[in-house]
Amino acid sequence: MNLSTGIIFCFLILGVSSQRWGTFLKEAGQGAKDMWRAYQDMKEANYRGADKYFHARGNYDAARRGPGGAWAAKVISNARETIQGITDPLFKGMTRDQVREDSKADQFANEWGRSGKDPNHFRPAGLPDKY
């Protein structure tokens, strides 16, 4: 595939006008960093019941970057849920029904954050203010 075909393909797939592709990619990169930061904070906090808060917060922060950030948050969230659908039964001993319910709740929190709603709705009592 030559370069021009690749660029046109990206514009069609990403749904971005040629005038905004640079901004979109910048927002997507920043959104990916927001998602990574929320994931790192979740691991650091290691706080029972806080995972939905971090899902919502990562998506919220990323989506605030703009369309590119919202796109990155959705792609990352969907990929994460797909991977967890495979690994959770193997490594956490979860049943398919448990995985399905957890994924549904995670996706609800993801969409909550991406839609601009306050992620603190999912914040558990006692989670340190640092987060």
From Swiss-Prot:
InterPro entries noted in UniProt: Serum_amyloid_A, Synovial_Prolif_Regulator
Source species of the chain: Bos taurus (Bovine)
Protein name (Swiss-Prot/TrEMBL): Serum amyloid A-3 protein
Induction: Up-regulated by Gram-negative bacterial lipopolysaccharide (LPS) and the Gram-positive bacterial lipoteichoic acid (LTA) in mammary epithelial cells and to a lesser extent by prolactin/PRL.
Subcellular location(s) of the protein: Secreted
UniProt-listed Gene3D superfamilies: Serum amyloid A protein
One annotated GO biological process: acute-phase response
Keywords: Acute phase, HDL, Secreted, Signal
Organism placement in taxonomy: Eukaryota, Metazoa, Chordata, Craniata, Vertebrata
